Amino acid sequence: MFGGESLTTIDAKGRTSIPARFREVLVTEFGDERFVVTKASPVDFDDGSYGRGLSVYPLGEWQELEKKIQANEGELPLAQLNSLKRLVLGPAQECTADKLGRVLIPPALRIHANLGRDLYFVGMGRRFDIWASETYARVNAQDERNFPQDSAALAALGI
């Protein structure tokens, strides 16, 4: 599983280094160094703006997700299903890190996520996300506002 946060940079050509522990998880837990980069679910900042980042799925996980979306396992209305396909499936790009662990983030996805020099890689279990550092600071603040206040529910999760 992907866990932890790593602060890294992206160069002028759009290349960034995937944290070594994430590369290791790709190979040891998912059996493949290939992965898919796509748009992450936007975070509503409650002020009319949204935080946009990227989600990275091991290839096998992505293929399973793609099957579920195509089969409409969420039973979404057609308009929502088509929006989901355009927002998640459409921009998805299969990638592989080079021998130095670097990956080229496709230009359209860099623009979408407003990626500047500093990036956060954030482990999310069976995927990881990539955020511009400024956006990630706002995402964290929003997450704190959204954090469940029900102590019994948190205790049941072991938190």
Swiss-Prot record:
Which NCBIfam families does the UniProt entry name for this protein? PRK00326.3-4
TM ranges are none
The name on file for this protein is: Transcriptional regulator MraZ
Q: Which domain of life is it from?
A: Bacteria
Organism annotation:
Trichlorobacter lovleyi (strain ATCC BAA-1151 / DSM 17278 / SZ) (Geobacter lovleyi)
Q: Where in the cell is it found?
A: Cytoplasm, Nucleoid
Q: Name one GO biological process term.
A: negative regulation of DNA-templated transcription initiation
Q: Which family does it belong to?
A: Belongs to the MraZ family.
Q: Which CDD domains does the record associate with it?
A: MraZ_C (cd16321), MraZ_N (cd16320)
Sorted alphabetically, the keyword list is: Cytoplasm, DNA-binding, Repeat, Transcription, Transcription regulation
Report the leader peptide range: none
